[in-house]
Amino acid sequence: MKKITLLLLFLTNLLFSQQAYYNGIDFTLTGEDLYNALQQRISNYNQNFTYGDARDVLVFTDENPSNPNNVLLVYGYNDTDGNCTTDRSRDKLDFGGLSCEYNREHVFARTLPVPDMGNVNNSTTGIGADPNNLRASDQQMNNNRGSKLFQNGSGTAGDVGSGNWYPGDEWKGDVARMVMYMYTRYGDRCLPGLVGVGNLQGTTQMLQTFLEWNATDPVTSYEDQRNNFLQGAYLNRNPFIDNPALATVIWGGPQAEDRWGILSTQDISATSFVIYPNPSVNSEISITSTATIDAVVFYDINGKIVLDLIQPTKSNNTIYIANLPQGFYLVKISSENKSITKKVLVN
């Protein structure tokens, strides 16, 4: 048996917020089981966070990555047409309720949950102040949207159908992932069918439209920026920003981007590959198989690739892993355009 010896240098400057946040969740779960696991995790939040705090953090969460003096405005699309209602970006100092100022948009509109969120003021806490549901928006654009339900469309934001709302090509993925967060965080109080129109995905309560938006409009660095900041301020995260493929695993629909590279459908028989010993002994892992192994990728539980082997010598391989921190890893084995992911514990 040919051996491959690898020394992995662990980078101490890696960010571990996601690793720590999702630690203990079994990502081999699917459907309602994974939904429940994520719901339990994100239900822990900063109970003292107010609607006023949400206003104050907008200048950080919604900062324009291209211009740190500005915030991005949800539904906005044109900064040069002379119409401030359609602005995509605005000076951070221009917060308020007047023309050409921006305010806080509840993407899952306040009146739509059952029961609804009620009136809000700067002292409000709870669902009405949840910053994962709030975006900077031009005040007139916010009024134009109001409590209209989301509906599929194309192009820029505006009215579609019979009094419904399309958030715009740029923002539809953001909206979908926020709706998914709200449904996961607050359950049946925020059913997707209360905030959007269209067909349900199979026997689930998720709208096909939101699954399509999630799959076709990938996560941006702006969404990551919001998620990372809000974990510090609000103490939870939006899992569907961290990995849109979680939605596919839970509700089905079109395959969304798997940002961790570990949630793809496992279409190789689990008996085709054996990883041993597991837990590992002295950081040594053996992979045996009668099939050709095209690639072996090790991920930490933050979804970070720590080892990537391409065509690692025939079908029987011994891989030595040194200097890895103790913990769980996911090993993705690819063979003939198929893959399977298995857990490994490094002691």
Please give the residue ranges for each predicted region.
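Bacterial Sec-dependent N-terminal signal peptides
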Residues: 1-21, 265, 341
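Short hydrophobic "helix-edge" motifs at membrane interfaces and signal-peptide entry regions
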Residues: 4, 95-97, 233, 268-269
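Boundary/junction segments of secreted and surface-exposed precursor proteins
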Residues: 17-40
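Low-complexity, Pro/Thr/Ser/Gly/Ala-rich linker/spacer regions in secreted
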Residues: 19, 254-271
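Betabetaalpha-Me/HNH-type nuclease active-site subdomain
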Residues: 38-148
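Domain-level detector of nuclease and nuclease-like folds
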Residues: 96-103, 107-261
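C-terminal outer-membrane/trafficking sorting elements
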Residues: 268-347
